[in-house]
């Protein structure tokens, strides 16, 4: 199977500590698929919630299809995510007991299907974000020093 990246949530790894990753399918309408093929999908500020034993992706944007008609889709509608019932039950336990969040990390094509890589995540505090930034800056500086010495 080939994996072609559609969109990535770059802020997710900065704002959250990713504990576990899972793959989920998405229930889409026809114009949404066409819009995704045109690269009009955004994962920023979106999340997943469990509602009545089903998993939904909220606040994710798939822009209007340019060549669509009056039956075009709603860009910010909630979309059902496809997982096995056993996996959803496990997610319910993690979210309720430990206070974790479910956030999309990236969207990609797997064959002809659109898949979301979800992260079970814990929010970082401000000082954790500062430490991450400091560590990243130090790694860049270290690489720069090593380059100039060789």
Curated annotation (Swiss-Prot):
GO terms for biological process: trans-translation. Belongs to the SmpB family. One of its GO terms (molecular function) is RNA binding. Its main location: cytoplasm. It is found in: Cytoplasm. Keywords: Cytoplasm, RNA-binding. The keyword Cytoplasm applies. This is SsrA-binding protein.
